[in-house]
Amino acid sequence: MQLLRCFSIFSVIASVLAQELTTICEQIPSPTLESTPYSLSTTTILANGKAMQGVFEYYKSVTFVSNCGSHPSTTSKGSPINTQYVF
């Protein structure tokens, strides 16, 4: 009798834990870039016969990964370099 009661309690606990651990598959967001550059570099550039100072901003891509179901999916965006020229 005690053994049946123990199994009954165990099955209730297992059911509650299974509900808590259920994975919810949602649409993953669109890929984005960080709003601030992680690095900057400068160099002197000669363009159209004029010397300029080039400022290069490097951005990291934010990648979202979903491992729901049998087909994992990701969204990512390339890490661009933003170039600015200072005269």
From Swiss-Prot:
Residues forming coiled coils: none
GO function term, MF aspect, one: cell adhesion molecule binding
Entries under InterPro entries matching the protein: Aga2
GO cellular component terms given for this protein: endoplasmic reticulum; fungal-type cell wall; fungal-type vacuole
Keywords: Cell adhesion, Disulfide bond, Glycoprotein, Signal
Keyword Transit peptide listed: no
Pfam families: AGA2 (PF17366)
Signal peptide extent: 1-18
Positions glycosylated per UniProt: T22, S30, T32, S39, T63, S66, T75
BP term (GO), one: agglutination involved in conjugation with cellular fusion
Quaternary structure (record): Heterodimer; disulfide-linked. Interacts with SAG1.
More about this protein: Present with 1160 molecules/cell in log phase SD medium.
Function, in words: Receptor binding subunit of the a-agglutinin heterodimer. S.cerevisiae a and alpha cells express the complementary cell surface glycoproteins a-agglutinin and alpha-agglutinin, respectively, which interact with one another to promote cellular aggregation during mating.
The protein, known as: A-agglutinin-binding subunit
Natural source organism: Saccharomyces cerevisiae (strain ATCC 204508 / S288c) (Baker's yeast)
Designated gene of the protein: AGA2
